[in-house]
């Protein structure tokens, strides 16, 4: 810096766009995972509270669109709660695998600069390091895993939404949707 001046501070000493991009990406996704976990924990608490309010509310569970057995609404909602907990578990497991520092991987084969990767991991809030430098720059599977976890979680919510919609039909008449959440036909009654 003394010889070159302030421009020297812009040198990519010991780092590459490859490891920088993966580092920033992992920091972004760990935030998304934490936000998702927080939302799921709150949703699960609300579902459990609603289940507790309905331990004696009898309903029919259907299989293949046929009445099968009597259960309680509380029992049904606890199934939703269990599905939410499995999603929380998946996100927490992903967080552990994903929150590893790739910085210092360089372009792919590391760097000759004496970087303290453990220190950068600690400073950036990572729990550890991606040990293999090629994986540190080429490993992007955490994005696909996050998308997969989202799809699994949202399919569970989709099941709930679909069943509530079905229960609100004239054939079932088990639930009533607030008009703000229901659509109507412009032609049919």
What are these regions, as identified by a protein language model?
Residues 124-189:
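Acidic, glycine-rich loop-and-beta core segments that form the ion-binding/anion-interacting portion
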């Amino acid at each position: 810096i003394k010889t070159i001046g302030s421009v020297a501070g812009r040198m990519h000493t010991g780092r590459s766009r490859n490891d920088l991009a993966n580092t920033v990406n992992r920091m972004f996704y760990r935030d998304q995972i934490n936000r998702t976990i927080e939302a799921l924990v709150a949703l699960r608490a609300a579902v459990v509270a609603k289940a507790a309010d309905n331990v004696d509310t009898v309903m029919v569970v259907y299989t293949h669109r046929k009445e099968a057995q009597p259960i309680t609404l509380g029992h049904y909602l606890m199934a939703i709660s269990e599905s939410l907990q499995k999603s929380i578990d998946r996100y927490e497991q992903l967080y552990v695998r994903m929150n590893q520092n790739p910085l210092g991987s360089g372009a792919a084969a590391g760097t000759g600069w004496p970087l303290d990767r453990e220190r950068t991991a600690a400073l950036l809030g990572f729990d550890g390091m991606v040990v293999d430098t090629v994986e540190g720059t080429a490993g992007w599977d955490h994005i696909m895993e996050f998308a997969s976890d989202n799809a699994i979680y949202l399919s569970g919510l989709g099941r709930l939404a679909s069943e509530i919609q079905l229960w609100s039909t004239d054939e079932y008449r088990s639930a009533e949707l607030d008009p703000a959440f229901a659509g109507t036909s412009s032609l049919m009654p």
